[in-house]
Swiss-Prot record:
The gene is secA2. One of its GO terms (biological process) is protein transport by the Sec complex. One of its GO terms (cellular component) is plasma membrane. The keyword DNA-binding does not apply. This is Protein translocase subunit SecA 2. Keywords: ATP-binding, Cell membrane, Cytoplasm, Membrane, Nucleotide-binding, Protein transport, Translocase, Translocation, Transport. Monomer and homodimer. Part of the essential Sec protein translocation apparatus which comprises SecA, SecYEG and auxiliary proteins SecDF. Other proteins may also be involved. It is found in: Cell membrane; Cytoplasm. HAMAP family: SecA. Its EC number is 7.4.2.8.
Amino acid sequence: MKHKLDVTINELRLKSIRKIVKRINTWSDEVKSYSDDVLKQKTLEFKERIASGVDTLDTLLPEAYAVAREASWRVLGMYPKEVQLIGAIVLHEGNIAEMQTGEGKTLTATMPLYLNALSGKGTYLITTNDYLAKRDFEEMQPLYEWLGLTASLGFVDIVDYEYQKGEKRNIYEHDIIYTTNGRLGFDYLIDNLADSAEGKFLPQLNYGIIDEVDSIILDAAQTPLVISGAPRLQSNLFHIVKEFVDTLIEDVHFKMKKTKKEIWLLNQGIEAAQSYFNVEDLYSEQAMVLVRNINLALRAQYLFESNVDYFVYNGDIVLIDRITGRMLPGTKLQAGLHQAIEAKEGMEVSTDKSVMATITFQNLFKLFESFSGMTATGKLGESEFFDLYSKIVVQVPTDKAIQRIDEPDKVFRSVDEKNIAMIHDIVELHETGRPVLLITRTAEAAEYFSKVFFQMDIPNNLLIAQNVAKEAQMIAEAGQIGSMTVATSMAGRGTDIKLGEGVEALGGLAVIIHEHMENSRVDRQLRGRSGRQGDPGSSCIYISLDDYLVKRWSDSNLAENNQLYSLDAQRLSQSSLFNRKVKQIVVKAQRISEEQGVKAREMANEFEKSISIQRDLVYEERNRVLEIDDAENRDFKVLAKDVFEMFVNEEKVLTKSRVVEYIYQNLSFQFNKDVACVNFKDKQAVVTFLLEQFEKQIALNRKNMQSAYYYNIFVQKVFLKAIDSCWLEQVDYLQQLKANVNQRQNGQRNAIFEYHRVALDSFEVMTRNIKKRMVKNICQSMITFDKEGMPVIHFP
């Protein structure tokens, strides 16, 4: 019933879109007769019509799409089909276009990018990795430039490249930018650490199209982008605590709920810890560092699995995205968890650094005036797209009917029986000449099967999502006759597999999937590797009671039923009841996995709300400071008065020595100690006296400046220093607070409420501290000039 309703709703959406397609087709017939020069001139004409208010982007869409369509044919030799026009309209409307593999998403995106670039505010195509961004940019750049727009890659594709002054600003001044979600996110954070207006480079984020949108803003939504700062005071307990945790027994010393990523000590575990570490009360204030390290070690030992959550690669812990299987080099778990995993693996513990700036992809893309997305599997995430981003998903029809045959799951009792049968089936397929793509959940499994096939004298390509460019080339060749490819779920994603000569007659590409993934969207993506653009093909998933999905998420006892293992394997495999039961277990386990994923993203979104609001307020304040261009004429007495009133109200008793000490520490190093005229019992009199000292020091500082220009720079720098130092402490504190709250095992709603309450309290403290440091910095900072005559500011 629900499926029928979804189809009906989608058809209604398509009906209104097809009316616009008709208008585009009418304009397409018109512009075919235009000369190249006339067609090129349309871009300038469109810009003028938008600027003058004659047209909006919406009213201009049919004509602009027709121009971009015709230009695509003349420049690229590709003419967007009607289904691509439908996708392009969905993208301009700010929604999610579900387009199947091979339907031409790259070309589809050019039309809304062109249209929105006409506003002069910039547009972005955001994808998952550097290779895809560069590939698509290089392919489409000639089209944009022929039409009179500027286009750029959002980064310089050189490892550890150091950008020159103004280079990033030049990049972001282009009309159309191809980049990655990670690059854009870090640029946003870096831009908001700029210490001058000239150092900022990122414009207002206007319009963006996200390729593989479900992967980026759903699956990766919880992964924060982090810029690290100074090292934290490092604990030396990681290895010691790891040895203690190794002695603990589940359900005796600790309890865990793997599905919820929860683990905690039981009473016997607490007693064991107190005995092992000779501590009277494990939960006393003195032992809190020890408790934190025990919690980290427990999570590292039992909730994070090698080759599932992370690889040990070249002596480092490299995280893995559990949903996509993609490696996340350079990404570290926060709050000491990364170091606990290093200790678990017997490695040297790396330095845990404080957090300077952070943002999640959820909040990054909410900064756009409008954004849309493309994916082959959007419908399965529609409710989440709508709840989190107010986006609807429109299923775009395929140009040709899908011919791929998705075979029923093949069911086995154990993973060993499954592997034997699967290898047998693959060998049979290979002997016919059909290309085979075997997809595994982990790199470890992929390496195992690749080795097995080589031992059977079957050459194969192994792809485990490590070298994106090389693997894109290898996956592109996976459709050739007789080819055998073994890959993880993310390897080569974004690259079409085209069938070689003679393969169509053999039945097309055979996709064999070693087990169901934790998310049904990923299953669909993997099946979609075969059968592009109406090609023949097939897909089949092999399942067993030993599969990770069942072991991790199933609440059924069937997998542990020893009677099953006493039955004859052939009899069991022919039992429809057994097959049906196992399929039910797998489907339920996958549903639980997906539900937990949704809940985890909802939780992450809840936690992010506080820091998101605070970040916006702090960055707005930074920008106001950067816009100061008349510091000489600014009156800072209101700021100073607030700070001095805080001081007198915080002191229980005001004495001469305390006031003199305060002046030395915050206002002037040269104070002459003359406070004879001050009535220390009158707080307002003390505030007035401090204001007088403040004004004297400000006047002295201004006198020491060479010009109003340098005084302006001085004020900007000292205020930014105050904001940044306090914000750095606040961000790091919130990261630690979130980690501590996440370790609580019950009362989740109360824990989140408590987090927001403490976060608000700490923000108010930070705001007061910023004001205090501003006053201290503007009074006690000094400016000198280097050999080149450039100002150097020395902070107190």
